């Protein structure tokens, strides 16, 4: 369960999503055997939206890759739901978790914005 290639926490460098996706894919292509069936990304400190958007972009730009690319997010999947939970909003919690799960599913097949 890797993270995407991102600047370090202390870096002020701004990198476009397309460059993050390219560097991540290049690192995977160089180091992960094609026999590996799938790679499940951690969010690696990315916010919920960015984690999903970048996973989606990976799957859109590289549709013929050797492995399935998906998510294994904890914080990025639960963050919105936990905010609702902290306010005692059970219905909001359920809706937020369902929305985030659907978004990440769509990102894992490159269909987030379709």
Go through the PLM ranges and name each one.
Residues 1-114:
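Active-site capping/gating regions of soluble enzymes
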């Amino acid at each position: 369960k890797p993270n995407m290639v991102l600047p370090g926490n202390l870096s002020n460098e701004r990198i476009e999503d397309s460059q993050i996706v390219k560097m991540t894919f290049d690192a995977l292509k160089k180091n992960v055997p094609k026999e590996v069936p799938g790679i499940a990304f951690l969010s690696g400190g990315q916010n919920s939206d960015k984690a999903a958007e970048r996973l989606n972009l990976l799957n859109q730009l590289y549709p013929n890759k050797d492995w399935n690319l998906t998510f294994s997010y904890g914080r990025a999947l639960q963050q919105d739901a936990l905010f609702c939970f902290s306010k005692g909003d059970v219905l909001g919690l359920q809706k937020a978790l369902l929305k985030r799960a659907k978004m990440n599913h769509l990102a894992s097949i490159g269909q987030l914005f379709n």
